[in-house]
């Protein structure tokens, strides 16, 4: 990004809103047939200098997801259960979440993480 807030031609990185600093997303202006970058948080948008869009999809396995967030068992926003005790240490409480996997076979699978401080065992049922 240049000091004046513009991007060099052909820039393919992430763009940010000049109003609220959120990420800008590609958006088509169908009436004028141009590509825009628009903020999903406010009304800011800017015309793209290049009509090329690159998509980089990254998928993660549940083990990767729970290791990325080392303190997932301490997350107060995750639901907890005592109906699925840890098979490794016997602790009764676990947090659980549904993976955002795109694979159809994982669509409704729940993943559990033991909340015992010394354990952190991860499993699915």
UniProtKB/Swiss-Prot annotation:
One of its GO terms (biological process) is transcription-coupled nucleotide-excision repair. Belongs to the archaeal RpoM/eukaryotic RPA12/RPB9/RPC11 RNA polymerase family. The modification N-acetylmethionine is found at residue 1. Component of the RNA polymerase II (Pol II) complex consisting of 12 subunits. The keyword Zinc applies. GO terms for cellular component: nucleolus; nucleus; RNA polymerase II, core complex. Zn(2+) 2 binds at residues 86, 89, 114, 119. Keywords: Acetylation, DNA-directed RNA polymerase, Metal-binding, Nucleus, Transcription, Zinc, Zinc-finger. DNA-dependent RNA polymerase catalyzes the transcription of DNA into RNA using the four ribonucleoside triphosphates as substrates. Component of RNA polymerase II which synthesizes mRNA precursors and many functional non-coding RNAs. Pol II is the central component of the basal RNA polymerase II transcription machinery. It is composed of mobile elements that move relative to each other. RPB9 is part of the upper jaw surrounding the central large cleft and thought to grab the incoming DNA template. CDD domains: Zn-ribbon_RPB9. Zn(2+) 1 binds at residues 17, 20, 39, 42. The keyword DNA repair does not apply. This is DNA-directed RNA polymerase II subunit RPB9. It comes from the Eukaryota. It comes from Sus scrofa. A zinc finger (TFIIS-type) spans 82-124. GO terms for molecular function: DNA-directed RNA polymerase activity; nucleic acid binding; zinc ion binding. Pfam families: Zn_ribbon_RPB9, Zn_ribbon_TFIIS.
């Amino acid at each position: 990004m240049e000091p004046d807030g513009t991007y060099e031609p052909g820039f393919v990185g992430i763009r940010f809103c000049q109003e609220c600093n959120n990420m800008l997303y590609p958006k088509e202006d169908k009436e004028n047939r141009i590509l825009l970058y628009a903020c999903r948080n406010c009304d800011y948008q800017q015309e793209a200098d290049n009509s090329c869009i690159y998509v980089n999809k990254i998928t993660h396995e549940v083990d990767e997801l729970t290791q990325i967030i080392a303190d997932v068992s301490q997350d107060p926003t995750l639901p907890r259960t005592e109906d699925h005790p840890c098979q490794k240490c016997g602790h009764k409480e676990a947090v659980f979440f549904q993976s955002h996997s795109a694979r159809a076979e994982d669509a409704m699978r729940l993943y559990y993480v033991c909340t015992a401080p010394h354990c952190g065992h991860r499993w699915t049922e």
